[in-house]
Amino acid sequence: MGSKTPDGHRQSPDASNSSELKPASPNPKPSQNGSQSADLDRGVVGEDDDDDDENEEVGVITTNAEKKKKRKKSKKKNKKSKSGAAPATQQTTPPRVPLSTLFPSGYPVGELVPYENTARTTDEESQYNSRLWDEDLLTDYRQAAEIHRQVRQYAQAELIKPGASLQSIAEGIEDGVRALCGHQGLDTGDALKAGMGFPTGLCLNNIAAHWTPNPGGKDVILEKSDVLKVDFGVHINGRIVDSAFTVAFDHTYDNLLTAVKEATNTGIMVHVFLDDLVGSEVMESYEVDLAGKTIPVKAIRNITGHDILRYNIHGGKQIPFIKNNNPDKMEEGEVFAIETFGSTGKGVLDDDIGIYGYGRNANVPGSHLRLASAKSLLKTIDANFGSLVFCRRYLERLGVKSYHLGMKNLIDNGIVESYAPLVDVKGSYTAQFEHTILLHSGGKEVISRGEDY
């Protein structure tokens, strides 16, 4: 989920580390936790009534009678096992088998790439950094990453096709994530244990980021000529894996997708200082032939990658992918979303009409609220989403009604921030690729890497 500049579009940092820290392990054990709506989009609010057998041993000689008894026992056992569900050994279609069932001994490790820390680090700092990643923390990230891989594989094969509605694609992705996490998010607080890291972004053509189907909007149908960005996050215990890809059915856009994918991979190889990132140079070496014209691919300059904190998709660091004077550096113990965006347009994004989603501003208390509907809505937000970004679909899934006036009041008071879709000029096409990387004592781990991208 991209962070727009200069506004930032990010939550306040609120990181928390495990109280008992251990050195990073390459293969840790798995964690045990596994019409009014449209008006609100436009900022208009109307009237709202808010107020193996048991005895079987190697080397034991048995008589024929004993063998017969054992056969009878095993037959009973087999009969009993037929009546129950057989243990799953592979994922279903659609994905519904919890990941903890498929990976009882540990989750896959991401791609490990060389990490050259050229900064001076004292022995004390090195010892502290090596303890930042405990086994449960790494397990949470790796579980979330594998869920992302399995769900997006299903989405690419079964959901994302010409003629499909974006609503059905979003719901298919989100249903898969919740099933594999083992948390449906319907009970109070359940969505904070595991589930969606933020609403599924499904952005067509000149819409580069921050669009999702919402109640009150028209049902958008995916066409063969469209370029679709798919951006979704998975979290386990607040540890968010953020990854995105682009789909185009027309080979006309192959160079656009290749340019952005290569730029993202270039960004992943950056070692420490964020001003070293030169993904834009890679991206802008490509051209796209559109309607008989050769159009250079432009790097979108006012949207960036970002660090990720616990329960906060946007931390305090931005990761621009154009040449810059950013003094920030990547440090061991941090998590980053490395993403790049390319366009056949002007390469600058503006806010569009509508609202993608909302994020709680943890720095602003709600104690001064007077509107009853705003107080009630804030209580629901804090109990179910905390500082995770959410959308109206998620509120209505919980059964929340008549929330429009209360939401406007929360936004007006700075307690909740709204996110608008980000667009380039009409008629242009945009693409995005993104991965989450972890910097730990074992190196740089591209946690969301898969065979697809």
Swiss-Prot record:
Which InterPro entries does the record associate with it?
Creatinase/aminopeptidase-like, Met_Aminopeptidase_Type2, Pept_M24, Pept_M24_MAP, Pept_M24A_MAP2, Pept_M24A_MAP2_BS, WH-like_DNA-bd_sf, WH_DNA-bd_sf
Listed GO CC annotations: cytoplasm
List compositional bias (Basic and acidic residues) regions by residue number.
Answer: 1-12
* Top class in the EC scheme: hydrolase
Where, by residue number, does substrate bind?
A: 210, 314
What subcellular compartments does it reside in? Answer: Cytoplasm
Q: Where is the composition biased (Acidic residues)?
A: 46-57
Residues annotated as region Disordered? 1-101
Q: Which PROSITE patterns has this protein been placed in?
A: MAP_2 (PS01202)
The UniProt keyword set, sorted, is: Aminopeptidase, Cytoplasm, Hydrolase, Metal-binding, Protease
The record's section on Pfam families has: Peptidase_M24
Q: Which reaction does it catalyse?
A: Release of N-terminal amino acids, preferentially methionine, from peptides and arylamides
Binding site residues for a divalent metal cation 1: 231, 242, 434
Domain of life assignment: Eukaryota
SUPFAM superfamilies listed in its UniProt record = Creatinase/aminopeptidase, Winged helix' DNA-binding domain
Instruction: Specify where it is mainly localized.
Output: cytoplasm
GO MF annotation terms: initiator methionyl aminopeptidase activity; metal ion binding; metalloaminopeptidase activity
The cofactor note from the UniProt entry for this protein is: Binds 2 divalent metal cations per subunit. Has a high-affinity and a low affinity metal-binding site. The true nature of the physiological cofactor is under debate. The enzyme is active with cobalt, zinc, manganese or divalent iron ions. Most likely, methionine aminopeptidases function as mononuclear Fe(2+)-metalloproteases under physiological conditions, and the catalytically relevant metal-binding site has been assigned to the histidine-containing high-affinity site.
The record's annotation in Gene3D superfamilies points to: Creatinase/methionine aminopeptidase superfamily (3.90.230.10), Winged helix-like DNA-binding domain superfamily/Winged helix DNA-binding domain (1.10.10.10)
What does the record list as GO biological process?
proteolysis
Q: Which cofactor does it need?
A: Co(2+); Zn(2+); Mn(2+); Fe(2+)
Q: Which residues bind a divalent metal cation 2?
A: 242, 306, 339, 434
Write down the HAMAP family for this protein, in alphabetical order.
Answer: MetAP_2_euk (MF_03175)
Protein task: Cotranslationally removes the N-terminal methionine from nascent proteins. The N-terminal methionine is often cleaved when the second residue in the primary sequence is small and uncharged (Met-Ala-, Cys, Gly, Pro, Ser, Thr, or Val).
Family statement: Belongs to the peptidase M24A family. Methionine aminopeptidase eukaryotic type 2 subfamily.
- Protein name (record): Methionine aminopeptidase 2-1
* Organism in which the protein naturally occurs: Aspergillus terreus (strain NIH 2624 / FGSC A1156)
